[in-house]
Amino acid sequence: IEFPAAPRGGAAVIDCDQIPELAARERISCVIVAERDSQRRTEVAAALLDCRLRGLRVVDAVDFYEKLSGKIWLEGLHPQWLVYTDGFDRSRLTVCAKRSLDLLFAALLLLLTSPVLAIVAAAIRLDSGGPVLFRQVRVGQHGKPFVLYKFRSMRQDAEAETGPVWAGEHDSRVTTVGKILRKFRLDEIPQAFNVLRGDMSFVGPRPERPYFVQMLRPRIPFYDLRHCVKPGITGWAQIEYPYGASIEDAYEKLQYDLYYAKHMSLRCDAVILLRTLGIVLFGRGR
């Protein structure tokens, strides 16, 4: 087996058993292991054992990337890392506390925005006629489908001729009122009903449509892992990544979704909600 290294800013290809010698000669203090193949990882680990016992830091590339970027490196992700890494904890206390806060905030949101809801409903009817609410099947936790509610921001039968397509940042199907609703995230308020029903949480990966889940699953590794937590009205990917409407964007967003799934906590939710509130109040973003 060969092992790439970069002493003194250059590049070298060495055998695994040469790693300790190279580390000592070049005074290397940390080795980052970026190897997905389980057999090769075992051989590299055996060679690094001597280095580790001498005080050399050995770091998995996925962990290194995560700390630098705030997302999980999909290209380097491997099953062993998922099994042995810290995080992805689902303590009963955290789940119960998160659910209790979801119920409280959803009820408060609907109560406090009730005058706004009536105005929005009237504006939609006057602008484009048709139904006020938009209903669509999405994929929830553990792959369970549910009906998501939003204020309708597009014209009726927007996909009648095209079939399922991703919504774009400057989507021509969006109505005049819909543009305002999207800018201030007002179209998302009815999802508080989804939160009350238990289909969603306030914070989590955005739920995707079954059509796109089926399309992305074979194209993006570990895609189904995003379904290990409840989907959310807002999420880590939504505040860290711009509006996306492609497979490449879905790939990038999944890295943020997995980061959230790993670090899900009340503190993490609070940070995301506060940043989302800033976006809503100042109309930044989508």
Can you say where each PLM-predicted feature lies in the sequence?
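Short, solvent-exposed positions on alpha-helices
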Residues: 42, 59, 187-190, 268
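A short, structured surface patch at a secondary-structure boundary
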Residues: 167-230, 272-280
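Phosphate/oxyanion-binding loops and surfaces in catalytic or ligand/nucleic-acid-binding neighborhoods
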Residues: 50-54, 107, 126-129, 154-157, ...
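A hydrophobic, helix-centered structural microdomain
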Residues: 93-158, 194, 266-286
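Short, glycine-rich, amphipathic interfacial segments at transmembrane boundaries or analogous
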Residues: 3-8, 65-66, 71-75, 134-176, ...
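Residue-level signature of the cytosolic catalytic core of signaling kinases
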Residues: 15, 89, 93, 169-170, ...
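N-terminal hydrophobic signal-anchor/signal peptide
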Residues: 1-114
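C-terminal terminal-structure detector
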Residues: 211, 220-286
